[in-house]
């Protein structure tokens, strides 16, 4: 894994597809005019080869080659499992 590979963390919001999970990653962006930090949420489609993620899990995922039109990320590690 090179240093330029993007690693992100997010919470799994859907596991309805085979070998794919939908992850929501939050980030804070400063408003250009008012200066307040606003929470932004981005939805990522992540490749989960063994279907090991459950809804609510917090995972770490990295950018990789495109698996499909929308899926360009793959699972690295499950940080916290939802009970």
UniProtKB/Swiss-Prot annotation:
SUPFAM superfamilies: Nucleic acid-binding proteins. The keyword rRNA-binding applies. GO terms for biological process: translation. One of its GO terms (molecular function) is rRNA binding. Gene3D superfamilies: Nucleic acid-binding proteins (2.40.50.140). GO terms for cellular component: cytosolic small ribosomal subunit. The keyword Transmembrane does not apply. It comes from the Bacteria. Keywords: Ribonucleoprotein, Ribosomal protein, RNA-binding, rRNA-binding. CDD domains: Ribosomal_uS17. Belongs to the universal ribosomal protein uS17 family. One of the primary rRNA binding proteins, it binds specifically to the 5'-end of 16S ribosomal RNA. Part of the 30S ribosomal subunit. This is Small ribosomal subunit protein uS17. The gene is rpsQ.
């Amino acid at each position: 894994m090179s240093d330029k590979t993007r690693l992100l963390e997010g919470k799994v919001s859907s596991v309805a597809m085979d070998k794919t999970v939908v992850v929501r990653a939050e980030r804070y962006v400063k408003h250009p005019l008012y200066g307040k930090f606003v929470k932004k949420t981005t939805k990522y489609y992540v490749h989960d080869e063994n279907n090991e993620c459950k809804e609510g899990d917090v995972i770490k995922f990295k950018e990789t080659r495109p698996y499909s039109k929308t899926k360009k990320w793959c699972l690295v590690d499950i940080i916290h499992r939802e009970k």
